[in-house]
Amino acid sequence: RVGHIRVFAAFASLASLVVLIHSVIIHPFIWFLLRILTGVSMVCIYTVAESWLNDRSSNKNRGSVLSIYMVILYGTMGIGMFLLNFSSPKNFQPFILVSVITSAALIPILLTKKKPPNFKKIQAMNMRELYEASPFGMVSSLFYGTIQSALFTLLAVYATSMNFTILEISIVTFLLAISGAVAQFPVGKISDIYDRRRVIVFSTFGAAIFAIIAIFVSRQMYLPGGLATSKTWFYFFFILFSFCSLPMFSLILAHTNDYISKEKFVAAGAGLQFAFGLGAMSGPFLCSIFMDLVGPNGFFVFLFIFHSFIGFFGIYRMKVRKTVENPDSQFVAMPQTITPAGIELNPTTEHIEEPYSEKVKEILERKGVKYKKDENEDQKEEVTY
């Protein structure tokens, strides 16, 4: 009703002011409400940005656009962790810095001369349809949402409780984002060659094993020769954990697409995102219970258990259902935060109906060519003489 630019500006402003309120009112319940507002704002911002990218992409460059988007998303996520070192997290300065960066994102959007696209209504599969199409896809997406939300939300809490310095916390969170982005492509290539369920099972059990190893190397770690106390080995095994764990959503999406027609790829992706979101709501709460019962290492115990759940369920599904070869389905790296609008950037989905450019319209209209909207198809234009 109000357009992309106004929606982006409104929710970016809301996100910016919500961050500042954190430093004004320090109360757990108020922060709980503020986090809800932040989540709503970020989903709306992502939806606007990804639908805009989708509208500006053609069938020839959708994959490239998605790859660049992935690099920017994970890269800035990793670099952003180092902002913790500008000031103590106990002070109000970090909140101001986040608010400033969020507000700065408005400048290029508000000054653009490009015409904003129209929103597309994307209907997600309901949970029953999604489960019938791919039980393993839906269940693993639900569990993985639980894993991911706990991982990104409580990693800093775990590191703080293990007496990591602020710089070391920044390094750990940076390694999580960057190694996860780098792992997308080799893991995806392997999944295009072998049964995706087998790749998912090996990845989940690999992540579970490295989570347990991380527990044993997280306290006193020494460089070869006993040079100095160091967290080098923890970083090393945490990178291996990220390599196994972070490509999971893209693998789950590709696996689900193996069992459905190309026309349903976007709807299935939206359904998986919904299942992922349901799991994500419970992740931090469940993980915090483990950390209360076991101590800080309950963080990795939680990750071990839920990765194992996915792995064992995958083994069960391989016994009751044969793999299929869908020529329309292939692995495409996708961030976990992607919205249904962004899923359309997946080059394996249906071709985008590309309307004539404004310049072509102007030239043809000079020659007596008239345009009219086709009543049977949304957003499609045809030429009539």
Residue ranges of predicted features:
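Intrinsic disorder in cytosolic terminal tails and internal cytosolic loops
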Residues: 117-124, 317-385
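C-terminal membrane-cytosol helix-exit motif in multi-pass small-molecule transporters
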Residues: 84-85, 99-119, 310-318
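C-terminal transmembrane helical hairpin of 12-TM major facilitator-type secondary transporters
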Residues: 197-249
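Intracellular juxtamembrane helix-capping segments at the cytosolic ends
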Residues: 44-57, 246-260
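Loop-to-transmembrane helix entry/capping segments in MFS-fold secondary transporters
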Residues: 59-69, 166-167, 260-272
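Helix-to-loop junctions at the C-terminal end of transmembrane segments
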Residues: 1-4, 88, 183-195, 291-292
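Cytoplasmic helix-loop-helix junction between adjacent transmembrane helices
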Residues: 36-71
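Structural signature of the two symmetry-related core transmembrane helices
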Residues: 6-20, 99, 198-213, 304
